[in-house]
Amino acid sequence: LSLEAIKERRDVIHEHGIKNVRVLDRTFNYNNKRAKELLNLFREYPDICFHLEIHPALLSDELKQELATLPKGLLHLEAGIQSLRENVLEQSRRIGKLSNALAGLHYLCSLENMETHADLIAGLPLYHLSEIFDDVRTLTEYGAGEIQLESLKLLPGTEMRRRADELGIQYSPLPPYEVL
C-alpha cells in the first residue's frame, strides 16, 4: 500500500477509537527507509499501540535512532529470531547474519520506550526439540518481555511450501497449514 493509503486507514482507525493495531507485514524493516516513514505516520497518534514484526538483523543505525525517539507505548515489537542455529537459518534461507540478529535483539530489548518479544519457530528444517529448549534458555539472557514459540506454517505460494518435500517437512493441507 502507498503511504497515503496507509495514512487514510490509520486516520479511520483513530476516528473509531481503536487503541491496538497489528501490522501484518513480516518484513516491516526490510526497507529501512519505508519503515522510518511508517514510524513517522504512527508517531502522529501516540494513543494507538502498533504491533509490528521486525527483523533484528536488518536494523540500520538510522532506524535504531528513530526507534529510540518514539513515544513510550507506541510500539510493541516481535523480533523474528526464528532459531539460534546457523544451519537451521541457512536451510530456511533466512536473510541476515545470526550475530546481527542477536545484536539487534539486544538493542531492541534495551529500549525502555517499547515492549520487545523474541520469536522462535518450531518445525524449521534441521531444528530439533533439544535445540529449541537451549535457544529459549539463551534468549532469556536478552531481556525480551516474552519469548514466543510458534509452529511453522507452510502457507500456499511460499518458498518453504514449495520445498517441503525436499526438506522432508510434512504439514497439514488445511489452514493454518502447520507442520505436523
Positions of predicted regions on the chain:
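Radical SAM [4Fe-4S] cluster-binding motif and immediate context
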Residues: L1-S110
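Short, hinge-like loop/turn segments at secondary-structure boundaries
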Residues: L39-L41, A68-L70, D135-V136, A164-G168
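Catalytic cores of alpha/beta
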Residues: E62-L67, P125-G143
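Mobile, glycine- and charge-enriched loop segments
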Residues: L102-Y127
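Flexible glycine/acidic-rich beta-alpha junction loops that bind and position SAM and/or redox cofactors
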Residues: N32-K33, I81, N87-S92, A122-E131, ...
